[in-house]
Amino acid sequence: MARERRDSKAATFFCLAWALCLALPGYPQHVSGREDRADWTQEKYSHRPTILNATCILQVTSQTNVSRMWQNDLHPILIERYPGSPGSYAVRQHIKHRLQGLQAGWLVEEDTFQSHTPYGYRTFSNIISTLNPLAKRHLVIACHYDSKYFPPQLDGKVFVGATDSAVPCAMMLELARSLDRPLSFLKQSSLPPKADLSLKLIFFDGEEAFVRWSPSDSLYGSRSLAQKMASTPHPPGARNTYQIRGIDLFVLLDLIGARNPVFPVYFLNTARWFGRLEAIERNLNDLGLLNNYSSERQYFRSNLRRHPVEDDHIPFLRRGVPILHLIPSPFPRVWHTMEDNEENLDKPTIDNLSKILQVFVLEYLNLG
């Protein structure tokens, strides 16, 4: 961002309920194209979600638990974690451990590299977690896990970046945990279109500037990974297509966790996907699934347009990747201050946004 500026019985019930969701009629299902269909890299532009019915929505949202997320994922991330710090290593190990322990069988990789910074060469490590590496197309959900570097303070305080971006990291881990069974179902599917489309979670290092935001002092992790993906053949063995062409939609989360956020539209070419978030928010409210919520303060507002903000999506945008940027406008009042901490987070808002995001992901992956 341009920033100076439960048990086995319960498990069986869930599986049966999910099978019922998949069997229920009355909702449009994704129809696979001809076997000789055109270039697969173009399918993202005509992709249609499978709209979840009320039964499925109720089942999905019953699996998420914001208090468990708070304890198991948010607290371990709410530490100083600028690139190269002990906290950065600890958070990176936590993210990998949580993802590797899931039944879906994620491929979790570290993308480690060195880059020149105002403080000399530093080592950075992105975390890329892929549900099915053999799938041609991937929905990408991303955030950054580093915190902005602040010199030692006289009062001993450290910057933990609660909204920036500990909460998005925790939300992504909770998404993977709470959707573990449907995502396992997706991975085991061998028939198109499900076998052709999967999910990728990316946790970027080095989003923040060390000194002053500039093209060379910012977005270290995303710049490196975008370049790498643009030159890595995909699917394996391909000669003319690369990993970056396999990104269907790049959903970037940032500055999330404060009360009453407003998310505007930043990119018109992905406005239809923003519209799905808006519709899901409305549906969840109608079902009574949003806490401490007023429709007068809705989160996603398709009638609001804002100029793009520099963030980890930029290196991908420049390579033609469709972007859905979920960053509030205005920024939280605690942005880049020591007050961006746990005390200033709003748990109901985070819970609500987690539910919306999880439904969105299932719809996009045609798991409904």
Curated annotation (Swiss-Prot):
Any transmembrane segments, and where?
none
The record's EC number reads 2.3.2.5
- One Pfam family assigned to this protein is Peptidase_M28
What UniProt keywords apply to this chain's record, in alphabetical order? Acyltransferase, Disulfide bond, Glycoprotein, Metal-binding, Secreted, Signal, Transferase, Zinc
From which organism does this entry originate? Bothrops jararaca (Jararaca)
Gene Ontology annotations of biological process type: peptidyl-pyroglutamic acid biosynthetic process, using glutaminyl-peptide cyclotransferase
Q: Which domain of life is it from?
A: Eukaryota
Protein family per UniProt: Belongs to the glutaminyl-peptide cyclotransferase family.
The cysteines covalently paired via disulfide bonds are: C143-C169
Record's protein name: Glutaminyl-peptide cyclotransferase
GO cellular component assignments:
extracellular region
Q: Which reaction does it catalyse?
A: N-terminal L-glutaminyl-[peptide] = N-terminal 5-oxo-L-prolyl-[peptide] + NH4(+)
* UniProt-listed CDD domains: M28_QC_like
Q: Does the keyword Coiled coil apply?
A: no
Record function comment: Responsible for the biosynthesis of pyroglutamyl peptides. Has a bias against acidic and tryptophan residues adjacent to the N-terminal glutaminyl residue and a lack of importance of chain length after the second residue. Also catalyzes N-terminal pyroglutamate formation.
Tissue distribution is: Expressed by the venom gland.
Spell out where the chain is glycosylated: N53, N65, N292, N352
Q: Where does Zn(2+) bind?
A: D164, E208, H336
* Coarse class of the protein's main subcellular location: secreted
- Secretion signal, residue range per the UniProt entry: 1-23
